[in-house]
C-alpha cells in the first residue's frame, strides 16, 4: 500500500506514472480531499495551492495497469466537524459522487482531529457515532466490494492500552465494528510521529524493529479494553512507515524494514509508505 500525498513542494507525480508500479506500489491512496466547514468535499484542480487531481480517464489507466485506487480522507490539515450529524451527512452527499465519478475502489479513513472517545467502550461519543455515520453512509451507496481502510495514528489505537478516553483508543470501537463485520480491508496504522504502544501500556521508540513488532503483535493478539477484545489479524495489517526521514519521525532504514517484515514470514498484508511523493522526491 502507499500514500499519494498532494504536497506541492515535493513535486507532482501523475497517478499513472509507470515508476509507481515499478517501485512496488500496488495500492494508491490519494490524499486528501478538501473539506469545507459545512462538510462539503472538494476534489478538483486548485482545491489546495497548486494541487492537481487525476482525471477519471487517468484513474482508469492506473487501474488497468494493476493499481487499486483508494481516496484517503482527513490528514493533518483536512479536518471535519465530527460533532455535527448535518456536517457528516453533507460530507457523505458530496463525497459519494466524487468517488463514483473518479472510479475509486475504496476509501481510507485518516481523520486526525475531532475524534474523541467517551471513556466507556460500549458507548460511542458523538464524534465516534458521526464517523460511523460517515462510513456507513458511504458504504451504503457504493458497490458491495467497495473497500474500507483506516490509517489512524498510534494514540488512537494501541494508545488505548494506556487509557481509554479522549484521543486514546478512539478508533478502537470503529475498527472493531468493521473488522468484525468483514468490511475492513486492512488497517494502515501510522508507525511514526509518536510513541509505539504494546497491549499493556508499554511504550517503544518509533523507528525500531522492537516497536514495530510490539504493536503488530498486540493488534493480532487483540487489545482488551474494558473487557472487550479488539483484534486485527496479521493478514489485515498494513503498517504505515515514512518513505524517508523528511516524511515523519520514526523513519526506518530499508534494512530495518526488512528485518521487521521478515519477522512475520509473509503473514502481514503489506506495508504502506507516507508517501509516494516523499519517496519520489528523494
From Swiss-Prot:
Please state what class of enzyme this protein is: hydrolase
Q: Which GO terms describe its cellular component?
A: extracellular region
Cross-referenced InterPro entries, in alphabetical order?
A: Glyco_hydro18_cat, Glyco_hydro_18_chit_AS, Glycoside_hydrolase_SF, Glycosyl_Hydrlase18_Chitinase
What are the coiled-coil residue ranges?
none
Substrates-to-products reaction catalysed: Random endo-hydrolysis of N-acetyl-beta-D-glucosaminide (1->4)-beta-linkages in chitin and chitodextrins
The record's active-site residues are 112 (proton donor)
Please provide the record's keywords in A-Z order: Carbohydrate metabolism, Chitin degradation, Chitin-binding, Glycoprotein, Glycosidase, Hydrolase, Polysaccharide degradation, Secreted, Virulence
Glycosylation site list:
265
Biological process according to GO = chitin catabolic process; polysaccharide catabolic process
Q: Where's it found, cell-wise?
A: Secreted
Gene3D superfamilies tied to this protein:
Glycosidases
UniProt GO MF annotations: chitin binding; endochitinase activity
The answer to whether UniProt assigns keyword Lyase to this entry is no
EC annotation?
Answer: 3.2.1.14
Domain GH18 spans what residues? 1-282
Q: Which family does it belong to?
A: Belongs to the glycosyl hydrolase 18 family. Chitinase class V subfamily.
Described function:
Secreted chitinase involved in the degradation of chitin, a component of the cell walls of fungi and exoskeletal elements of some animals (including worms and arthropods). Participates in the infection process and directly acts in the penetration process of the host cuticle.
> What is the protein's given name?
Endochitinase 4
- Species the sequence originates in: Metarhizium anisopliae (Entomophthora anisopliae)
Species classification = Eukaryota, Fungi, Dikarya, Ascomycota, Pezizomycotina
